[in-house]
Amino acid sequence: MGVSLRHLSPSSFWVSRRPRVSSSILSFLVPRRRILCTRKVAIIKGNAGYSTATDCGGSHGFHHSGHQRSSSVEFSGEWKLNLGSKTARMVPPTVKQAGAVSAWREEVNNKLRGRNREYANNQDDAFGNGSYILKGFVPKIDDVHSYGNGQNFDYNLKPGTDITTLGRELNGFMQTNSIRGSVVALPSKDIEVGETTDVTLKPLNSDTTLDNASYKKTATISKVEKCTNLSQVRANLKKIYNRVRVVDNVSSAKETVALLMNQYRNLVHACDTEVSRIDVKTETPVDHGEMICFSIYCGSEADFGDGKSCIWVDVLGENGRDILAEFKPFFEDSSIKKVWHNYSFDNHIIRNYGIKLSGFHGDTMHMARLWDSSRRISGGYSLEALTSDPKVLGGTETKEEAELFGKISMKKIFGKGKLKKDGSEGKLVIIPPVKELQMEDREAWISYSALDSISTLKLYESMKKQLQAKKWFLDGKLISKKNMFDFYQEYWQPFGELLAKMESEGMLVDRDYLAQIEIVAKAEQEIAVSRFRNWASKHCPDAKHMNVGSDTQLRQLFFGGISNSCNDEDLPYEKLFKVPNVDKVIEEGKKRATKFRNIKLHRISDRPLPTEKFTASGWPSVSGDTLKALAGKVSAEYDYMEGVLDTCLEENIGDDDCISLPDEVVETQHVNTSVESDTSAYGTAFDAFGGGESGKEACHAIAALCEVCSIDSLISNFILPLQGSNVSGKDGRVHCSLNINTETGRLSARRPNLQNQPALEKDRYKIRQAFIASPGNSLIVADYGQLELRILAHLASCESMKEAFIAGGDFHSRTAMNMYPHIREAVENGEVLLEWHPQPGQEKPPVPLLKDAFASERRKAKMLNFSIAYGKTAIGLSRDWKVSREEAQDTVNLWYNDRQEVRKWQELRKKEAIQKGYVLTLLGRARKFPEYRSRAQKNHIERAAINTPVQGSAADVAMCAMLEISNNQRLKELGWKLLLQVHDEVILEGPSESAENAKDIVVNCMSEPFNGKNILSVDLSVDAKCAQNWYAGK
């Protein structure tokens, strides 16, 4: 895939080390010695007393036990090493203008002053508001461009330090203007990942008492990166160009295809396309984008003339379509093996030109994810990230190739300064369009784009070798004479091809329906906005004009006057805000209405509202959870809104809008104004506003604000995106991207995220109803029942859970019965029923159902069933239930009392994760874990060790079911195709006349997904429906 960023560089290494740093000893920042311009260090083992940052100008700290007082200040910025003057400076995280830089600098100074107030405040007179002291921390910023990593700035002061000593220490240690000796000395040899080496540290200022101190520590290399030398990169590009055959005419294309399909047909061919006119973040490649070139590489043994082993094909010119047509037989030949990096993208791009790819042999992105599922966080799966990591290539490349295959971004090679109005280049770097590069910087572009296919084949060979070295365990048992590359070929290779087919099929969307519910949603949103504004304006008149979507304005309204939780700043009681002057108000002193006007917002309660949630900057949160806590579990409707609905509906829905509002919207015009005496459902705002009618009004109004946010989420995340042409093809079908990029192996979706549909109970506009079958067709929506709990019962060999599944019925009610003796007694005495199957003429059960009579206990049982499967602890449950940790632990123990096998299995998985560094799913996929360095990290690993085998095995089952459905010959004959998988649910489309027959086949495939068998010790329950839209199929 040729539209991502890539890396290409010479082989000189940066080495990265990260230390463990004691917070009780003095640290100061010093620049690196010049040799470190080609090495970066990050220690993962060894108690070295210094710290480092990233990029060419890192920061180093040196610690001394003579200073006992320590604190840490965190802010954004990065130390940049100036090799010319041997100085280091802190620079802002992004390109900024001078005014913004000053504000950034002031912010840093304020943070430092806030953490060391007793020193800074005492020096205001002597040093001009502490500027001398603080300049020691934040050097003058001349270059405001570059970098963007947050830093931990360790600031230490010895108690009783006098002014002179303090000034000398800060000047010497922090401004780094007197550099002497090496900061970190490394051996001159090449350093590799995992190697242990000694590092030496020295202080930098001869005026300090630390002058003769030096530390030598042992460090283990954790990361190796390659340094960028642009001239060397261009030289390497030249070497690649000399190995590339350029195909830019039909005659050359015919010769090349003949060699590919005859002499070299038995080789593995790595292919890649380069595409323009597409935004890969927002647009589907189906019917979008223009292919400008592609490359093919089948190894150095191939010779396409003059020793050239790589093919680069130009399809940009006038005869581009004719050239591409010559390669159609090659691409469609199923016997010629082809590998890709992100196959689905290239597949869609080539299909746009009427070519149906065949001969899919592997996707190196999927292979890398199978090899190490944790790289999504630690390195990524882009071609540049993988080929730049020596651990990935695993020694498969030669020394010369090692210099060529590490890649840097297009921006580094092709970036140019954006032209200013006067024609000169500015500092903002932009990348010219790839079409322009192909025509104007042709040789470099050919080399750069051809490198994609060369790197893909190298990556394929490496991943094949790495996977062959891994044993394959199926359901915990070793499969002899097979390895994880066999697993890839048997499962993930056909699964990758199936996902590409599903993306190509897409789902038909009823845009008229979406347009209608958009009108309704916006109308309801306006109603909710008016409800909140009308209430708030009773307490603060200008709130009638506020922006209810502004966190800043809401925070002022609810929490004005509150103190910051991180420092001594206070939020003002009242504040002016600039808002659009929609009413054309002419403010005092002005002759006409301006575009914006000022409003004054102040706190609307006698004291700041109660809250337990704060932002990272220390101010009260106004997130959805905070608002829900204030409102409680009440509706947005209340009698003070009389007349508001009619006005909003008239303004938002005209006579020409042919749409029926849902009943619940219309009924809000006749709200019952009688308010119940029970106040348990009301939130914390009830007491804050004095209880009674005022408290109830406040809760209902804030509930209306919650409704505003909820509706806005549905509009912005679902209703509007699904109507966009960027996610659909020419046929009006929505084509999302399906990816195996989660650590557990579950699928994710994007552009758009169809897996993120609102829960049925929250789908107030029935958005799934917009996904429809084509005329003459129907949908089959099939869903596993309690899949993960059934997998847990199998993995843990839990007899109690197995028996409950065999008995059938409401699993959560059975769990509650086994947890609570009083419920079991009620069931045995016939006072309640576990479940009830009505007979003709029966309207209600003879006695209450367990789920109704003991709703609270069943609710806890249901939450525990899923929470324990995901590794949730009593601590998390106590927060969810708002009970003590002891009470939550007692309830958890009740669950385990009948399921001791689950507890034992979980303990084994936790031990396995810590000792071996990985856990396995049902089909043998591994999830790796890093070494933990804190209790919190260990807890996270242990939770993931419990969750991954369950959730990952569910992904295995779903994948096998999809392969079983896709390979079913009868379903193919009937014309049914898979469209989408959403967690444990699959959706197919096909002719309506065979829907019921096809549904039975689908259920059978999902019930026995392992090549026509079920290897689990529990049955797989499947529910399926035939319908005309997704919502009706649920």
Swiss-Prot record:
Keyword terms of this UniProt record: Chloroplast, DNA damage, DNA repair, DNA replication, DNA-binding, DNA-directed DNA polymerase, Exonuclease, Hydrolase, Mitochondrion, Nuclease, Nucleotidyltransferase, Plastid, Transferase, Transit peptide
Spans annotated as Polymerase: 700-1030
Gene3D superfamilies membership: 3.30.70.370, 5' to 3' exonuclease, C-terminal subdomain, Ribonuclease H-like superfamily/Ribonuclease H
Gene label: POLIB
Annotated InterPro entries: 3'-5'_exonuclease_dom, DNA-dir_DNA_pol_A_palm_dom, DNA/RNA_pol_sf, DNA_polymerase_A, RNaseH-like_sf, RNaseH_sf
Protein name (database record): DNA polymerase I B, chloroplastic/mitochondrial
Disulfide feature: none
Transit peptide start-stop: 1-55
Signal peptide positions (record): none
Species name: Arabidopsis thaliana (Mouse-ear cress)
Tissue: Expressed in shoot apical meristem.
Lineage: Eukaryota, Viridiplantae, Streptophyta, Embryophyta, Tracheophyta
Catalysed reaction, written as an equation: DNA(n) + a 2'-deoxyribonucleoside 5'-triphosphate = DNA(n+1) + diphosphate
CDD domains reported for this sequence: DNA_pol_A_plastid_like, DNA_polA_I_Ecoli_like_exo
3'-5' exonuclease domain mapped to chain residues: 270-468
MF-aspect GO terms: 3'-5' exonuclease activity; DNA binding; DNA-directed DNA polymerase activity
Disruption phenotype: No visible phenotype under normal growth conditions, but mutant plants have reduced levels of DNA in both mitochondria and plastids. Double homozygous mutants polIa and polIb are sterile.
A Gene Ontology biological process term: plastid DNA replication
Main localization category: mitochondrion
GO CC terms in record: chloroplast; mitochondrion
